[in-house]
Curated annotation (Swiss-Prot):
Pfam families: ATP-synt_D (PF01813). The gene is atpD. InterPro entries: V_ATPase_D. This is V-type ATP synthase subunit D. GO terms for biological process: proton motive force-driven plasma membrane ATP synthesis. Produces ATP from ADP in the presence of a proton gradient across the membrane.
Length: 203
């Protein structure tokens, strides 16, 4: 603990007591914020792990299925099938505030189907159709995964900042204020006793 360099006066004592009350209120609010951020963070981490497992599993299975589908078609024909995107997608990224943390919210809009696309269910095979359908169904999961991972990163940063502020108040500011208040109270008591002794001597 470090005693603050202030004059031991009653006015200073009152000021320090107000500062201590404010620091203690701030400490409680920050601890509550940290705990709630941690609760949400843990929930998001669980969702992130589950989503990642699902997406990776789909991608691994789909790559195997694609290898099989590709082996059943001419490689040049496969390249032509995917040479032009079959649809155009707009990605929208909005912002949401969660406990003073600005996090992304993503959604997409299919703006048009590309009529010039080489891919069609007539020119492909059923195996390739399955691969194509699975990849289309994965887009929403991939967007949510990106959203959750970014949110986790931002929340982890905020948790660390809040933790440092809580520790600063708990282990430095509040003890220093308390120590200084105690010191001033002792000094004022000493001054009162000395003053009382002088009065008694005068009498």
């Amino acid at each position: 603990m470090v005693r603050l360099n202030v004059k031991p006066t009653r006015m200073e004592l009152n000021n320090l007591k107000e500062r201590l009350k404010t620091a203690e209120r701030g400490h409680k609010l920050l601890k509550d914020k940290r705990d709630e951020l941690m609760r949400r963070f843990i929930s998001l981490i669980r969702e992130n792990n589950q989503l990642r497992k699902e997406v990776e599993s789909y991608l691994i299975d789909n790559l195997k299925a694609f290898a099989v589908a590709k082996s059943l078609k001419n490689s040049l024909m496969v390249e032509e099938l995917f040479s032009i995107p079959s649809k155009e997608i707009e990605l929208f990224v909005e912002k949401e505030n969660i406990m003073s943390v600005t996090v992304p919210r993503m959604h997409m809009n299919i703006t048009s189907q590309n009529e010039n696309s080489e891919y069609s269910y007539l020119s492909s095979n059923s195996e390739m159709d399955d691969v194509f359908a699975t990849m289309n169904s994965l887009i929403d999961k991939l967007l949510r995964l990106a959203e959750v991972e970014k949110t986790c990163q931002l929340m982890a940063d905020e948790i660390e900042k809040t933790r440092r502020r809580v520790n600063g108040l708990e282990y430095s500011i509040i003890p220093n204020l308390s120590e200084t208040i105690h010191y001033i109270e002792l000094k004022l008591e000493e001054a009162e006793r000395a003053n009382l002794v002088r009065i008694m001597k005068v009498k």
